[in-house]
């Protein structure tokens, strides 16, 4: 009689977490695992190889080689071989060049990685990409956000299911073989991008507005707001089933399956903020406050997501009501309505107007400067914004327009 080893609590918890995050029936669609060869992604791979076939789905993998290590190509090939042992198909290796991106080392690698993910989604028509972020990663993300001082949005961390990477949207410019990022929240591709993606696993919010993909040339520079009616209902999904699973548990999963994982040297490089938080800050917090700090930070992220999503929903509804498109390059917002609006909603409306009509993500400083335009006695009458956008007070309205649409 064949003896099967009894699964460990870590394996059981991870299987349950992935089952609860994915749809009950994948209808034979492909789900890709983002593989790096580290313990978290290998744990996600073995769990997905058990879970996804039971949900009537197919499992593949995408390995992104950043080329930052001398032996990175060999490691990518070893990861591919390991994925083949667990019957993943297809297995794609994407080689990227973060050095082409004009950002910091961490941001450059992330931008290049997600650009490769988008290419892979387009190439394979996959339903989703599974990212192996853990509860520890979530806690570190919340602390990083607090360091940046980005308000409640810094507390919400990463979502279990998202339709783009958090905080950024990515454009892969194949013509010049470079990658650029436009910072935005909850962005989507516009209707001119007809990639045949399946519907997401959770109902869409019909009141939420989405924004054009950066590569969309048909609306470049225009004040065009995109809503659900303009968006193809099929697009790629990013899923993080392990946000309640600790890094210790993913190590136990690899141990159970006899997997040797790769330790990225960059995960020990204290030049990076996340590494300093992981190795210097979190241990101090755990020792001085208690071992439950990372769980508290993760729980805070969940609660903050609920609050910020509701405030964003109210802000979107108000923007729907008050924004008027004056031309292809200009919109206006009524000052009286904004003056009567509570400050948290008012600031969100201002940010959303810039984001949704002009794909510009405003800093706190720029948002406050636009808010000052509401004061008739203030000396400020216009504000220069990124990407040649200007906000200007004219009569009872605030106009936002591009350089082409200057009043």
From Swiss-Prot:
Tell me the InterPro entries matching this sequence. Answer: Rossmann-like_a/b/a_fold (IPR014729), TilS/TtcA_N (IPR011063), tRNA_Ile_lys_synt (IPR012094), tRNA_Ile_lys_synt_N (IPR012795)
The encoding gene is tilS
Give yes or no: UniProt keyword Cytoplasm: yes
Quote the protein name from its UniProt record.
Answer: tRNA(Ile)-lysidine synthase
What is known about what this protein does? Ligates lysine onto the cytidine present at position 34 of the AUA codon-specific tRNA(Ile) that contains the anticodon CAU, in an ATP-dependent manner. Cytidine is converted to lysidine, thus changing the amino acid specificity of the tRNA from methionine to isoleucine.
Q: Which residues bind ATP?
A: 36-41
Report the enzyme's class at the first EC level: ligase
Its keywords, alphabetically, are:
ATP-binding, Cytoplasm, Ligase, Nucleotide-binding, tRNA processing
Alphabetized GO MF terms = ATP binding; tRNA(Ile)-lysidine synthase activity
Question: What free text does the record give on domains?
Answer: The N-terminal region contains the highly conserved SGGXDS motif, predicted to be a P-loop motif involved in ATP binding.
| NCBIfam families with a match to the protein in the record | lysidine_TilS_N (TIGR02432)
Extract the coiled-coil ranges from the record. none
Q: Which GO terms describe its cellular component?
A: cytoplasm
Entry superkingdom: Bacteria
Q: Which family does it belong to?
A: Belongs to the tRNA(Ile)-lysidine synthase family.
Q: Which Pfam families match?
A: ATP_bind_3 (PF01171)
Q: Which PANTHER family match?
A: TRNA(ILE)-LYSIDINE SYNTHASE-RELATED
């Amino acid at each position: 009689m064949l003896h099967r080893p009894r699964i460990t609590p870590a394996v059981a918890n991870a299987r349950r977490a992935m089952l609860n995050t994915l749809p009950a029936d994948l209808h034979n669609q492909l789900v890709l695992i983002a593989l790096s060869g580290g313990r978290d992604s290998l744990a996600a791979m073995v769990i997905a190889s058990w879970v996804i076939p039971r949900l009537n789905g197919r499992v593949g993998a995408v390995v992104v080689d950043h080329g930052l290590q001398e032996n990175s190509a060999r490691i990518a090939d070893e990861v591919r071989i390991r994925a083949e042992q667990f019957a993943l198909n297809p297995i794609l290796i994407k080689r990227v060049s973060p050095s082409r991106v004009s950002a910091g080392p961490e941001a450059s690698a992330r931008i290049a990685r997600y650009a490769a993910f988008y290419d892979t989604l387009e190439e394979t028509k996959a339903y989703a990409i599974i990212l192996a972020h853990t509860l520890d990663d979530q806690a570190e993300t919340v602390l990083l956000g607090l360091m940046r001082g980005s308000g409640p949005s810094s507390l919400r961390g990463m979502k279990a299911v998202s339709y783009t990477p958090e905080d950024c949207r990515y454009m892969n410019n194949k013509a010049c073989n470079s990658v650029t990022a436009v910072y935005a929240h909850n962005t989507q591709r516009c209707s001119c991008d007809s990639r045949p993606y399946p519907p997401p696993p959770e109902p869409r919010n019909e009141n939420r507005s989405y924004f054009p993909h950066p590569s969309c040339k048909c609306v470049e520079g225009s004040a065009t707001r995109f809503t659900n009616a303009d968006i193809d209902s099929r697009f790629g999904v990013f899923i993080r089933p392990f946000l309640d699973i600790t890094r210790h548990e993913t190590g136990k999963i690899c141990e159970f399956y006899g997997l040797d994982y790769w330790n990225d040297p960059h995960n020990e490089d204290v030049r990076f903020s996340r590494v300093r938080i992981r190795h210097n800050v979190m241990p101090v917090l755990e020792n001085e406050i208690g071992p439950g700090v990372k769980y508290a930070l993760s729980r805070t992220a969940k609660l903050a997501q609920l609050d910020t999503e509701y405030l964003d929903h109210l802000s979107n509804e108000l923007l729907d009501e008050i924004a008027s498109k004056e031309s292809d390059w200009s919109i206006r917002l009524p000052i009286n309505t904004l003056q009567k609006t509570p400050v948290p909603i008012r600031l969100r409306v201002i940010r959303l107007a810039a984001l949704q009509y002009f794909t510009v993500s405003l800093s706190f400083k720029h948002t406050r400067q636009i808010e000052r335009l509401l004061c008739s006695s203030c000396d400020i009458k216009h504000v220069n914004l990124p990407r040649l956008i200007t906000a200007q007070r004219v009569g009872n309205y605030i106009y936002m327009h591009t350089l082409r649409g200057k009043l």
